[in-house]
Structures are given as C-alpha cells and as structure tokens.
Amino acid sequence: MSRYRGPRLRITRRLGDLPGLTRKAAKRSYPPGQHGQARRKRSEYAIRLEEKQKLRFNYGVSERQLVRYVKKARAQEGSTGTNLLKLLESRLDNICFRLGFGPTVPGSRQLVNHGHVTVNGRVTDIASYQVKPGDVLAIREKKGSKQLAEGNLAFPGLSNIPPHLELDKAKLSAKCTGRCEREWVALEINELLVVEYYSRKV
C-alpha cells in the first residue's frame, strides 16, 4: 500500500485530529461519504484498524513500512506499543516537523528529500533516517533552505517542542538529547490497539 496523496481533510474527518498530516480542521464532525452521519456500532477489528490508520496517516508511512516498524518494536525490550511510537517519532521527517522546520510531516519530508537538512554536518535526504541521541540537525547554509525553514518556524504546526530536542532558532539547528517519551507524542492514539491489530498478521 503506497503513501496517501489524496484530500487530507477527508482523512481527518474519518480519523480525527492528525497534527502530522494537516494543520486544517475539518468543518464537519462526521465521517465523509453518503452514510457518514449514520450511527453504526463498530466491531473491535474496525476500532483497531482505525487506530492503525491514524499512525499511518499521521507519520506518513506505507503499510509495508509500518509492518517493519512493528517487527522492530517487538524485537526491542519494553512495551511494543511504546517502542513503536518512539521509532516513528525518531524519523527525520517527523523530527523536522516537531522542531517546526516543516509545517507538517509531508512538508518536512519534502524538506528532507530535497536536501535542505543536514545530520552531523552531512546532507541527509532520507526521511526515514532514525535520529539518535547526540545527533545534531541543521538547515543547510543556503539562502533557499534558510528561507523555507524560517518561514515555517514563524508558524509552527505544533506549539511545543518535546524536551528531548534542543532548538537553536538563530542557527537553525537542533540537538537530539534522548528519545521521545510517551507523554510527548502529539497524536491521540491507543498504540496497544495497533499492536493487537498486527498480532495475527505479523
């Protein structure tokens, strides 16, 4: 399943607020489609599927990528759900979004893919790069790169930067000092339901 490129508000109407996907708020509170306002009892499977879709769309990952992250989270010590969130939060495109370099995760991915971001002094154009504690991120010393980042920093998608990221706005750089703790994940998600969804599939 490829990455979604369709109308974003259609997704937020169905799944709720997804800060990584779009800044815009849906005007209608019910899901899209002909039967959007109908009240139907959802099955347990449908509820788990919805939570899984929230992760996919908020972090902009494909189904195949998410399966890989679930497998990796299982192999690590501790809670699989928490490990999964930490892996997704550590993606370079998401880190750039949390810092305010990009307006959304898709916008931050574009910033990374176009070579505007460096990690430890080297241009890194892989959005899925796992940012590690001690890594230093910066916007390239190019006029176009700086203008993009400065414009986005003036109107960040999220108001709070998580405490494991230290931002220097003047230098357009930041240092990762640790992993994102569960309480600093901006998405409202029940990660245990996501783990349950994949329990028989992976």
From Swiss-Prot:
Name of one Pfam family that matches = S4
Q: Which UniProt keywords apply?
A: Ribonucleoprotein, Ribosomal protein, RNA-binding, rRNA-binding
According to the record's subunit comment, the protein's assembly and interactions are: Part of the 30S ribosomal subunit. Contacts protein S5. The interaction surface between S4 and S5 is involved in control of translational fidelity.
State the family named in the UniProt similarity comment for this chain. Answer: Belongs to the universal ribosomal protein uS4 family.
Kindly list the organism's lineage.
Bacteria, Bacillati, Cyanobacteriota, Cyanophyceae, Synechococcales
Alphabetically, which GO biological process terms does the record hold?
A: ribosomal small subunit biogenesis; translation
Span of domain S4 RNA-binding:
90-152
Q: Which GO terms describe its molecular function?
A: rRNA binding; structural constituent of ribosome
Name this polypeptide is given = Small ribosomal subunit protein uS4
Q: Which domain of life is it from?
A: Bacteria
The record's region (Disordered) falls at 15-42
Q: Which species is the source of this protein?
A: Synechococcus sp. (strain CC9902)
Function according to Swiss-Prot or TrEMBL? One of the primary rRNA binding proteins, it binds directly to 16S rRNA where it nucleates assembly of the body of the 30S subunit.
Q: Is rRNA-binding one of the keywords?
A: yes
Q: Does the keyword DNA damage apply?
A: no
- Gene3D superfamilies, per database record: Ribosomal Protein S4 Delta 41, Chain A, domain 1 (1.10.1050.10), RNA-binding S4 domain (3.10.290.10)
How is this protein annotated for GO cellular component? small ribosomal subunit
